[in-house]
């Protein structure tokens, strides 16, 4: 897993 991707998805999921 990519740490960078995880961080970005974490922020996006929070909005979604």
From Swiss-Prot:
Name this polypeptide is given: Autoantigenic sperm protein 7
Miscellaneous: On the 2D-gel the determined pI of this protein is: 6.2, its MW is: 16.4 kDa.
Organism superkingdom: Eukaryota
């Amino acid at each position: 897993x990519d740490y960078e991707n995880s961080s970005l998805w974490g922020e996006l999921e929070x909005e979604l």
